[in-house]
């Protein structure tokens, strides 16, 4: 999933000079909720960049089948609504099916996704990641 999203991002950057941010959800949370970015103005600039970039790709949303904390769910919902109002595109990458994603991110965020007229693409098949030694797990 991430490789495909990366290819889309590369195409937009190379051929259409569009701005793209590709971030894991955990990294966004760390930067905004756990003071990885200590300066408030820098955090505000980062948040604005997430809102205004031409294409935002968020990888591993609600990873490990985890349910988002209320503050994270609220932030995601507001971020998606802001991007929708600005007519900015977003790609969410997750291992959740739509029903379990709804439970993991909550009503507010799920309704924000629906406002985009989303396309659910299920990708199946073996992992493309290389094996580690003789371990194939």
Q: Where do the protein language model's features map onto the residues?
A:
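Conserved Walker A/P-loop ATP-binding site and its immediately adjacent core
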Residues: 24
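A short, aliphatic-rich alpha-helical micro-motif
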Residues: 50-51, 113
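Short coil/turn segments at beta-strand junctions that form active-site/ligand-binding loops
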Residues: 18, 52-53, 88
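Short, catalytically relevant binding-site loops at active-site mouths
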Residues: 1-3, 27-30
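Walker A/P-loop
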Residues: 1-21
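Alpha-helical adaptor scaffolds
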Residues: 39, 44-48
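Walker B beta-strand of ABC/ABC-like P-loop ATPase nucleotide-binding domains
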Residues: 56-57
């Amino acid at each position: 999933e991430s490789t495909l999203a990366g290819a889309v991002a590369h195409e937009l950057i190379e051929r259409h000079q569009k701005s793209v941010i590709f971030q894991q959800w955990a990294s966004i949370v760390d930067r905004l909720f756990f003071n990885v970015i200590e300066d408030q103005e820098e955090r505000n600039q980062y948040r604005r960049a997430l809102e205004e970039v031409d294409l935002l790709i968020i990888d591993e949303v609600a990873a490990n089948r985890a349910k988002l904390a209320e503050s994270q769910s609220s932030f995601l919902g507001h971020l998606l609504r802001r991007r929708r109002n600005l007519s900015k595109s977003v790609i969410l990458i997750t291992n959740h099916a739509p029903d379990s994603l709804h439970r993991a991110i909550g009503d507010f965020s799920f309704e924000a996704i629906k406002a985009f007229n989303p396309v659910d693409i299920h990708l199946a098949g073996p992992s493309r990641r290389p094996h580690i030694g003789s371990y194939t797990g």
